[in-house]
Amino acid sequence: MRILVSGGGTGGHIYPALALIREIKKLHPEARFLYIGTENGLESTIVPKAGIPFQSIVISGFKRKISFDNVKTVMRFVKGVQDSKRYIRRFNPDVVIGTGGYVCGPVVYAAAKLGIPTIVHEQNSVPGVTNKFLSRYVDKVAVCFEAAAEHFPQSKVVMTGNPRASEVMNQNGMKGKRSVGLSLSKKSVLIFGGSRGARPINDAFVEAIEQFGNKNYEVLYITGEVHYDKVMEIVREKGNPDNVMIKPFIHNMPEVLTGVDLVVSRAGATTLAELTALGKPSILIPSPYVTNNHQEKNAKSIVDKGAAKMLLEKDLTAETLLHNIDEILLNTQTLQNMKLAAKQLGIPDAANKLFEVMKQLMKK
């Protein structure tokens, strides 16, 4: 079994691909992989580090305004297709999957034109430009949100969920809580703003820290390494309550997510896949700085089902943060209802579901 994977630029496109590869390796240790990305994307360091053969092509995304850069992009696309065809013929894959980001455009397009089974995986509720373009040529389009399906040819759409969801399952939540200093007997909320943190969330948290000290639940706050020193400087002045733990970063996020009762976070596709797979209630603060405002639309998909509350960044203050947390953590019935709603949305076997679709394509 030979599988070619392409996707990159951001972690949101790369980590689902790696989760899928790990799942396939568990089931088929003999499977061979080739990953095609760009040299300037995150994938050029993450993928080789994971022990997966990596090749690069030169490609860039379209600018939304008419510009000379777009002419160069078209030329790079044509060259990218030629280079991709060369790699594809050499590797001879049974199936090709693109997980988003402009790099997978020429790769998946080239594979489709060579008659190789192809599939794209769309993580967000609003598809990216590349996946919308590729949906005309591929055999299948795998989605994680029902809202994404309407943007693609219906005959090609399959709901698989995000392979990252599979990687947070079967973790030891008690071990996770202990590792960060949380009590096993108290309710707890985890607050974080993504891998690099988020200043508006930091500001609201710092403003609320004294009031958190009066609560009968515990708070674990992940600042992001960039913001840690600044946050701690303010916290030292205000005082750090015993029930509030502050960390720059944690390496065992799946364990900690499993252990806590409530999560406050951005609304990236990977985060939502993990939260729903675990049945975790959440307060989502979508980043307003992303393409097509897709985080707000991601959040709406699970807020509408009762699994989360949404707090827009423009409305985020110490008061609104505290109010939303109290409303869920201090009401056992609300907490329970949201847990059930999240669990019903989760697709914990997403990696296997996606692989099943790929296997069907290989048989054709």
From Swiss-Prot:
Alphabetically ordered keywords of this record: Cell cycle, Cell division, Cell membrane, Cell shape, Cell wall biogenesis/degradation, Glycosyltransferase, Membrane, Peptidoglycan synthesis, Transferase
GO annotations of cellular component type: plasma membrane
Keyword presence, Cytoplasm: no
Compartments it resides in: Cell membrane
EC class (word): transferase
Transmembrane segments: none
Pfam families per record: Glyco_tran_28_C (PF04101), Glyco_transf_28 (PF03033)
Pathway: Cell wall biogenesis; peptidoglycan biosynthesis
Function: Cell wall formation. Catalyzes the transfer of a GlcNAc subunit on undecaprenyl-pyrophosphoryl-MurNAc-pentapeptide (lipid intermediate I) to form undecaprenyl-pyrophosphoryl-MurNAc-(pentapeptide)GlcNAc (lipid intermediate II).
Annotated protein name in UniProt: UDP-N-acetylglucosamine--N-acetylmuramyl-(pentapeptide) pyrophosphoryl-undecaprenol N-acetylglucosamine transferase
Organism: Bacillus cytotoxicus (strain DSM 22905 / CIP 110041 / 391-98 / NVH 391-98)
